[in-house]
Amino acid sequence: QPMEDGVITISRADGKYTFPAHFQLVAAMNPCKCGFYPDRTRCNCLPGDISRYLKRISGPLLDRIDICTEISPVEYGELTGKRENESSEAIRSRVLAAHRRQQERYQKAGIQFNSQLTTRVIQNLCPLGTEETGIMEQAFESLRLSARGYYRIIRVARTIADLEEQE
């Protein structure tokens, strides 16, 4: 509950103490015990070993992580090749613009960022269109999403839209 509420309360005999608990979790883990899966030439883990390894992170904890991604090994050509990348200044500018959009949108709701969206605020200020509702219904059923997972997708989608200056 502290992750959702942004506060943690400790009850002791002499009273209750409440502390802020806003944080951003950034975590990484190997795909298996040896770290080389899915490269079967270097990974010697059995399927059961991989499954047990991945189950070390509890479902309820995973359900509270907004974005999970798999990273492929970097190819040599990517390290040495010249390619156009967005500058840090350009990214910073987009993020600040997204923050301004969020602060303006949620001013009356008493929040500042998409990460603070409650179910009620999402329903009032981030209504889904017919097409989006259909997509979310299909995702809810096929991915067997929890309510938390459903609203997490909407919060992340709202953030992506803000970064792309879209409604």
Predicted regions and their residues:
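Basic, amphipathic alpha-helical bundle interface domains used for macromolecular binding and assembly
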Residues: 2-167
